[in-house]
Amino acid sequence: IYVTDERQQLHFKQVFAILRKMGVPLNLKHVWFGLMRLPNATFSTRQGNVIKLEVLLDEAEKRAMDIIQQSSTTLTPEQQREVARAVGIGAVKYADLSQNPQSLVTFTWEKAMSLEGNSAPYLQYAYARISSVLDKYRERFPQGDYTAFPLLLQEPVERRLAVHLLRFDDTVLAAARTYRPNYLADYCYALAQLYSTFYQNV
């Protein structure tokens, strides 16, 4: 698998065509991705208009730390740094992976760091809520709850959540077959939304 930006499409079509004409058995794939741009400019190495990943991740971590320190928190300074790092790096990765890879992506800090909508901080918050519920369950049932009982899905949101969970395997397979990690990101976002509705109403 060759992964490049969209500008290399013709090159790989020609290379693969030549190899086929030569009788070379091919098990090759070119996976291309669209360009990422800032709101006011496109990244260009030739023009020197690039931001190094290290600089981008440092800025993301700083912005996450600002958000953490503005909220009322009982975290120690070390915990704040750990959370800021996880949220910052997650925000940058998710902002990239949640997009259709073959589209033009405009990166904005507002969207990447948003606590609402399809963003890493939103998903990380949902994960923290789910983990909190599981922690309380483990406190109450340290050996596990071995009582067997039929599971009755009485609320519509319970059924929607259960059906969505059953789609996980198909989503992973579709993402792998099509080289589209955004399918999995979309699945996770929909799951977080369903869980939030379930948490609030059931």
Residue ranges with predicted function:
Residues 1-202:
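Non-catalytic interaction-recognition regions
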